Amino acid sequence: MNRKVLIPSLLLTLFLALISQSGKASADECLNDMKTRVKGKENCLAIHTFLTVSEVKPSTLVIFIHGDQSDGGPVSGMIKLAEDVDVPAGVIKIALLRPGYFDKSGNTSSGTSWRRKDSYTPTNLDEVTSAVQSLQSHYQISKTVLVGHSGGAAYAGVMIGRSPGVANAALLLSCPCDIRRWRAFKKDAPWSSLSPSSFAETVPTTMKVITITGEYDDNTREYLAQDYIETLAKRGVSAEFRRAVGAGHNDIVRGDVIDEALRILLRLD
């Protein structure tokens, strides 16, 4: 046997084993304090929690889910939005980092982002859905609103149809609501990501959904959200498309763009 081949092979096996054990440990040893970390199905997801000091018992969760952040940098925009946007007393705002992402402070969600491409997988959707359900149970929440931007909007759109009851309402910003058509437009194929359009028929008719796409969004074009909303509306879901005048794909993540829509979705019966 050639020892020169055997030794590198053994080293590679040990290296891969260490990586596997490290990833498992990060999930098993999750702090899970429901303020900075929450356990998903198998992974430990970083979160930022914003709760206004009030005598009112918390009754509503607003979960902010960021986009793909394709520049490879830290997640920041949706965390700032979650911190800044005004909500009534009794509303807990939580910005959640998708599997494999990190923020400016180095807080990281375990799992994989699939190089920030094609990452709306069943496994990742299960992680985020499980995390939301854990937060609901911990805070004994009766109402939940999902706010997603771009890839985060795809997450939210899939979740409300794939896991009916996970939320009462969803605000989808710059939504690539039909992944097949979005990928075709971007000339990206093949893909494995789940699409909100594939789950439109199972979104509960009790849901409230608002999509907002920027007038100058050259990434997730308006028709992707418009057609999705039309499908929901035909089924009797309270669904509305809005155009953000003068806004592009990323600068739609601003309080002045979403304030009114979020107020509407928070007025849940």
Please describe what each predicted stretch is.
Residues 44, 53-91, 95:
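Short, surface-exposed "cap/lid" segments of acyl-processing enzymes
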Residues 112-138:
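Alpha/beta-hydrolase active-site loop
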Residues 147-152, 156:
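Gly/Ala-rich beta-loop-alpha elbow adjacent to hydrolase catalytic centers
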Residues 165-178:
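A conserved short beta-strand
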